[in-house]
From Swiss-Prot:
Keywords, alphabetical: Signal
Name of the coding gene: fip-1
Signal peptide boundaries: 1-21
Keyword Signal: yes
The protein, known as: Fungus-induced protein 1
Amino acid sequence: MSQIFQILVIFAILSALQVNGFLFPTYSSGYDYDCYGYGNNGYGNGGYGYGNGGGYYGGYNGY
């Protein structure tokens, strides 16, 4: 039972990181929900240090 709980916790952490753009930045970069809206506030990059997608999709989230 504890093993199942550990696996669920790991999946929750991985999914949270994926939403932030840590693991698969290309999956969510370029959209407003990427990196919790940092790009909407005029920073101009897709996360401002939230992983690999930040500089790559820099111009998309800032406008």
